[in-house]
Amino acid sequence: MIKQLVLAASLAGLAAIATPAAATGKMTCSAPQAKWKSRTALEARLKKQGWQVRKSKVDGGCYEVYGTDPKGNRVEAYFHPVTFEKLLVSRRGQILYRKK
C-alpha cells in the first residue's frame, strides 16, 4: 500500500514538472541553412521593435530568443530563420502567442 502511494505521488510530481515543457511543444523549422538570415540581423530587427534580447541560439532549425518583449514580458520566442516570422512566444510555460 505504501509503495503504491509513493509511486502515485512520484508520478504526480513528474507530471507537474513536465507540464510547462509540454505546453510550449517543440518547434521545428525546415529551411535550407544556405537561405538563413543571420541571428544578428534578427536581433537588430527585434531591438527596433522594442525587444530586449538577452540570448539567441538555433533550436530545432529555428531561432530561439530569450529576452523581454515590447510589453515587458520576459519570454522565450521562436522565429523562422529565413523569414523571421514569429512562430511561438511563451513565458514560464504559458503560451502568449502561437502561429496558427
Explain the meaning of each model-derived region.
Residues F84-K100:
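A short, surface-exposed interaction/processing loop segment used at functional sites
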